[in-house]
Amino acid sequence: MLNGLKPLSRSLRWGMVGGGGTSQIGYSHRCAALRDNVYTLLAGALDVDAERGRAFGEQLGITPERCYADYQTLFREEAQRPDGIEVVSVTTPNNTHFAITKAALEAGLHVICEKPLCFTAEEARELVDLSKKQNKIVGVTYGYAGYQMIQQARQMIADGLLGEIRIVNMQFAHGFHNQAVELQAESTRWRVTPKFAGPSYVLGDLATHPLFVAETMAPQLNIKRLMCSRQSFVPSRAPLEDNAFVLMEYDNGAVGSMWTSAVNSGAMHSQKVRIVGEKASIEWWDEHPNQLSYEVQGEPARILERGMPYLSPNALADDRIGGGHPEGLFEAWANLYRRYAQAIDATDRDDRAFLQDFWYPDVEAGLHGVYWVEQCVKSADAGSQWVDFTLP
């Protein structure tokens, strides 16, 4: 159980790009980063409005001279300081992620980037290569993967409790945008605007979350090919989709399906991952994230609860409070930020033995998600043809 002790001997000097006073996601990043006392927020370019960003930064306790007007100035000035930042979080609109992450790596910084990492697999591959060249990590915030029960599922599958995996069923299908809410809500408009959102809406914004959760649970599975059909039920959103179906074939013979939607009227998140093996199945639902359903053929279904001593050591390592108490998304994000900090520390110490088996959503995961969306769009726009899935 985590008890507030730092996993590192010191706090990392941390900065932010984006995440200002009007940013919901920026608050989530700060809550996660500061939970375990392994980051200290020292600098930032927090807002496109420099004065507004400076005022907000001062409210957060950042000294005025380290509240910068833009990310270029942030990286340049901090590089000149003996106490300059060593890691930066990128919490800006999608269309800026590539340029900012690239500039941060070139400035010698570790990066924690909101997903998507960028818009194209070519850009993502460039960031993978640059990360290796600079010997800096890039963490990608697939926040739901930080829940304790995801690690429990991963261990159960690794231990063979499900047997050979046959089926992976994934969905993230909410109903909050079943009407053209973006016409009144500016905060939603960017999600359906290609310039800002990229080549897709729900495939990139929603589906990549359960996709990564499933891949965290069963990392041995590799997609071989896929087929996608996407729709714009609110016509003004075209060419971006607000609903999509994806079929996948894996290299071990397993099959997968994804339903992602913003027009599933009446639904909340409805994000679920079900993995079916030859002996048993598991299912996780993000609206009940502290539970994992374990179903063995011919036996009553078992609901595993977070915080209980029967869980695997890997799952209990992310435990923050005793069983029976709920943990939520901020705790899941904090688990990831803790892992990013450990990866940064190990990278700086060149501790390759630690990093070899250490899991966190890394730059390769970012590449995988970007390429998956790219291939889904390619398939859908070609009349839902099957397309190969070979990472560039």
Name each model-derived stretch.
Residues M1-I62:
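N-terminal Rossmann-like dinucleotide-binding module
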Residues M1-L2, S11, G143, R191, ...:
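C-terminal glycine/acidic-rich active-site capping loop/insertion
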Residues Y39-L42, T347-L367, V387:
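Glycine- and charged-residue-rich phosphate/anionic-cofactor binding loop of Rossmann-like
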Residues R66-I85:
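A structured beta-alpha segment of the ubiquitous adenosine-cofactor-binding alpha/beta core
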Residues V87, P93-A145, G160:
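Beta-strand-loop-alpha-helix segment that lines the small-molecule cofactor/substrate pocket
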Residues G204-Q291:
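Glycine-rich, aromatic-lined ligand/substrate-binding cores of catalytic
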